[in-house]
Amino acid sequence: MANYFNTLNLRQQLAQLGKCRFMGRDEFADGASYLQGKKVVIVGCGAQGLNQGLNMRDSGLDIAYALRKEAIAEKRASWRKATENGFKVGTYEELIPQADLVVNLTPDKQHSDVVRSVQPLMKDGAALGYSHGFNIVEVGEQIRKDITVVMVAPKCPGTEVREEYKRGFGVPTLIAVHPENDPKGEGMAIAKAWAAATGGHRAGVLESSFVAEVKSDLMGEQTILCGMLQAGSLLCFDKLVEEGTDPAYAEKLIQYGWETITEALKQGGITLMMDRLSNPAKLRAYALSEQLKTIMAPLFQKHMDDIISGEFSSGMMADWANDDKKLLTWREETGKTAFETAPQYEGKIGEQEYFDKGVLMIAMVKAGVELAFETMVDSGIIEESAYYESLHELPLIANTIARKRLYEMNVVISDTAEYGNYLFSYACVPLLKAFMTEIQPGDLGKAIAEGAVDNAQLRDVNEAIRGHAIEKVGQKLRGYMTDMKRIAVAG
């Protein structure tokens, strides 16, 4: 199989990369009705599989889970989760032939095997659904021409998909129809009904393409969402300890600091995050972020280039074939870092203290978000897609670090995201070594003293922060998410 994106000519590539339309709420007036009375079979019962299924059932759809024979016979976790929640469970052979929509929610590396198994069993004219387009775009999976291929991609972990639905809300979602597989022209109707059944229409839906979703998703998770948080955690912890900070305090400042400062990001973008700082600290954070952007821009561009060309995917798939040797080695090495093994701090850190003593961390967030956004847009990805894959998901990933440090982040994210995270962080840490030697008192671990600032300089910095394209598109998109649940910040 050939990488689908690389089979397209330049005009087709640009058209698919740039496909992005914010859909009106009136387009979802029919809710999930298009799928009501039809049989939906989900393959895989992980975080996305279970939680999407729960939402879809609560929206009135007929949901069942198809699992491998051995998973059922051995009563594995997937079987237990599905049966404990009252779902019908059966083998591929028992359930797939009757399905009107088969939703493949297994991990990326299993997609080819799953599709190879279910496709011969699918009835003529059925639909195949994904929540990530890697198998179609990067692997180049060929699907029977009578089958409609659609995608509904919630921009949150599966647990959040469920929690927001239970609150009567939802999470922002991308939907798409594979242009090579829409024989009856019903792909968009299926995708809209599926998105409505998960609650995504209440938080905003982007009509996208498989290509745009994959390329932007890979870029976001490798750089700002996971790679920058991992590199920043390791660099900042080592710097604090080197400067004499108690390792336990340093660990807590970083572990919970990302979550606390990105909660402001979630509610009001980079503008609000920077407004939590004193004027002198804001000017310093801005200056640091500009330095970081200059240093890291080539690394961000390399990741985007390797994603566009398929170099990243081919390298990762080679590691799949080698029993994940690189991935598992990197995972083990990360678990042995000083940050991961530091003792816990039992004292309290106030919310504002995370901002006041985390100026460098704020600068890293600002630089990473803006660089990821800018690099995606420069590559032909529309601003709305770039926003969701950079700024929007960051607080959710930061929340995983607050639970159990980098270990938890790497457990929760997909293996694809984890592999890309290590590629980025292993390159970023040495890249920023020299920069870290120039850190001043007040940048990290100590607050910058209050003092006078130049009015004109402060005005210019405020205008630069608020005038960035991600702030403009973010203000519009956050307007659809006014009911977002607030992440509890640590003490």
From Swiss-Prot:
Residues annotated for Mg(2+) 2 binding in this entry: 217, 389, 393
InterPro entries: 6-PGluconate_DH-like_C_sf, 6PGD_dom2, KARI, KARI_C, KARI_N, NAD(P)-bd_dom_sf
Residue pairs linked by disulfide bridges in the UniProt entry: none
Active site: 132
Cofactor binding description: Binds 2 magnesium ions per subunit.
Function: Involved in the biosynthesis of branched-chain amino acids (BCAA). Catalyzes an alkyl-migration followed by a ketol-acid reduction of (S)-2-acetolactate (S2AL) to yield (R)-2,3-dihydroxy-isovalerate. In the isomerase reaction, S2AL is rearranged via a Mg-dependent methyl migration to produce 3-hydroxy-3-methyl-2-ketobutyrate (HMKB). In the reductase reaction, this 2-ketoacid undergoes a metal-dependent reduction by NADPH to yield (R)-2,3-dihydroxy-isovalerate.
Name of the featured protein: Ketol-acid reductoisomerase (NADP(+))
UniProt source species: Citrobacter koseri (strain ATCC BAA-895 / CDC 4225-83 / SGSC4696)
Lineage of origin: Bacteria, Pseudomonadati, Pseudomonadota, Gammaproteobacteria, Enterobacterales
